[in-house]
Amino acid sequence: MKRPSGRAADQLRSIRITRNYTKHAEGSVLVEFGDTKVICTVSVENGVPRFLKGQGQGWLTAEYGMLPRATGERNQREASRGKQGGRTLEIQRLIGRSLRAALDMSKLGDVTLYVDCDVIQADGGTRTASITGAMVALVDALKVIKKRGGLKAGDPLKQMIAAVSVGMYQGEPVLDLDYLEDSAAETDLNVVMTSTGGFIEVQGTAEGAPFQPADLNAMLALAQKGMTEIFELQNAALAD
């Protein structure tokens, strides 16, 4: 089996995380997984949604979108259609769930964190790149809250979160699929993990042929290997 990119089966794409990418957001990152590029921002606003009022905890919510020409052919803006598509809703819920797992909301205070992930170029793995980049932006946003005198109850950050895709391509497990691989893969799996080794979410679909338990175990092992490298990259970016 030869991957279109020439990478080894267990090799990630080149990953870059650029912090403080935009001027106004409390946390902002440009994350690049190969040719997939996503701008992730975290905005801080006082107050919480109505369903959390009086409960003494904060909240985090996420939105996701793609520029019309992030892909090979132009896609109509969802705003011009008047509603978000099912894929968009699914992905932004995944991003929100994943990042909430990083936080102790009771220590966040009366604050809502708005995570915005905007894909400027797509070549597979946009949701996993979004989670990975937004996590770094979230850490920076928490630092800003603390500088402003917030987080009186302590640090709400419990653990780092990252995500990566794995799949079965031509009968073999591969790590971090690009678009060519993703479109031809027999199985596509998105894995979200914590820096302590726990799983937050595993989303998997057999596109061409059913995958077997041994295949699943092999894909998860690949994801764990890749995640170790991604957490190192996140930490290196935050150390700059």
UniProtKB/Swiss-Prot annotation:
Classification via PROSITE patterns: RIBONUCLEASE_PH
GO molecular function: 3'-5'-RNA exonuclease activity; tRNA binding; tRNA nucleotidyltransferase activity
Catalytic activity: tRNA(n+1) + phosphate = tRNA(n) + a ribonucleoside 5'-diphosphate
Cysteines joined through disulfide linkages: none
Enzyme Commission number: 2.7.7.56
Protein task: Phosphorolytic 3'-5' exoribonuclease that plays an important role in tRNA 3'-end maturation. Removes nucleotide residues following the 3'-CCA terminus of tRNAs; can also add nucleotides to the ends of RNA molecules by using nucleoside diphosphates as substrates, but this may not be physiologically important. Probably plays a role in initiation of 16S rRNA degradation (leading to ribosome degradation) during starvation.
Protein name: Ribonuclease PH
Native source organism of the sequence: Pseudomonas fluorescens (strain SBW25)
